Amino acid sequence: MEVVPVQIAAGTTSTLILPVIIAFVVCFVSIILIVWISDFIVYTSVLVLTLLLYLLLWLLLTTPLQFFLLTLLVCYCPALYIHHYIVNTQQ
């Protein structure tokens, strides 16, 4: 009887880390763009486009529960905070 080694851990780890890396990179870039752009309509467009981009990437790379939790924690919460900050400082 032969024992055949199976390397599941390496593939699983890389597929779990990849969406998180993509999320943080896109979130970081969108936050920098939003802070540098003062026009409300332009910053909203940039925000919506980046959110759509990474929602599509996450949907392809994660399970539904991971997708939901990552979207809430990394995507919508920082975006909502920045949105409120910019709206309150423009008044």
From Swiss-Prot:
Species per Swiss-Prot/TrEMBL record: Human papillomavirus type 6a
UniProt superkingdom: Viruses
InterPro entries: Papilloma_E5_alpha
Family under the similarity heading: Belongs to the papillomaviridae E5A protein family.
UniProt-recorded name of the protein: Probable protein E5A
Keyword annotations: Early protein
